A protein has these predicted regions:
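Tubulin/FtsZ superfamily GTPase core signature
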Residues: 2-168
């Protein structure tokens, strides 16, 4: 399949089988479907929203064109530990068995409350950049949500990994 697409995100069904979660087949498919739906909605929102710094379809194409395996993660944080919570959510995904380690292309799209400190944004972007390849190209999007307080939502799309033979 990867030979016929620009980018591929895989949800290994084996990761839905754990001792802690006793899922029926229907429940496991619903979880995989929900992850896929959430990711598609996140990409659609990135493309269609008009934020302070926009990410458009051309930007998504730039990141994903000919990229091979890809990683997508969505993080949410509120309050004092919001940045660290988000970093933990977007750097890697246990379910997808992927991370941004070695990514040479990233989209980082942030929606934040209007009271967010610039130091929070700096901490977030530095941690994401540090986790990727040293020469990573980052397309950054940013908007505000006036209905939230002390909160951030972040979508990260990572692609074009240094070692394409490994799962990112």
């Amino acid at each position: 399949l990867i030979k016929h697409v620009d980018a591929l995100i895989v949800i290994p069904n084996q990761n839905l089988i754990t001792n802690e979660m006793r899922l029926t087949m229907k429940q496991s498919y619903a979880i995989a479907d929900e992850v896929l739906k959430t990711d598609v909605i996140a990409i659609a929102e990135i493309i269609t929203r008009h934020d302070e710094i926009n990410v458009d379809f051309a930007d998504v194409t730039t990141i994903l064109k000919g990229a091979g395996r890809a990683h997508i993660a969505i993080g949410h944080g509120e309050g004092k530990d919001k940045v660290q919570d988000i970093i933990n959510q977007v750097i890697s995904s246990d379910l997808l068995e992927t991370s941004i380690k070695g990514a040479r292309r990233l989209i980082v799209n942030v929606t934040m409350s209007e009271d967010l400190l610039i130091s929070d944004m700096d901490e977030l972007t530095a941690a994401i950049a540090d986790a990727a390849d040293d020469n990573v190209e980052i397309i950054f999007g940013n908007g505000t949500n006036p209905d939230t307080k002390d909160a951030m939502d972040v979508t990260v799309i990572a692609a074009d990994f240094v070692d394409r033979d490994d799962v990112p």
